């Protein structure tokens, strides 16, 4: 009697969706309070002036202004928000 044993299932074939990490607002772009500037795992970029950090290390704007990226001594990257001087009305 012809017979073929059941084939084993493949152990591959899974992949997780991308996490959509990275810089969301680049240097020179204007932001309002609450805008996400960087989504990251760990502190690749540290918060500077007028920037807050969420529990998942997301950096966000605390004030209205323009995004500025900078490298400090030791190679640490920082992002801050410089308030835009409004013209006197």
From Swiss-Prot:
Residues 1-24 are annotated as: Disordered. InterPro entries: Ribosomal_bL27, Ribosomal_bL27_CS. Keywords: Ribonucleoprotein, Ribosomal protein. It comes from the Bacteria. Pfam families: Ribosomal_L27. One of its GO terms (cellular component) is cytosolic large ribosomal subunit. Signal peptide: none annotated. GO terms for biological process: translation. GO terms for molecular function: structural constituent of ribosome. The keyword Transmembrane does not apply. Belongs to the bacterial ribosomal protein bL27 family. HAMAP family: Ribosomal_bL27 (MF_00539). This is Large ribosomal subunit protein bL27.
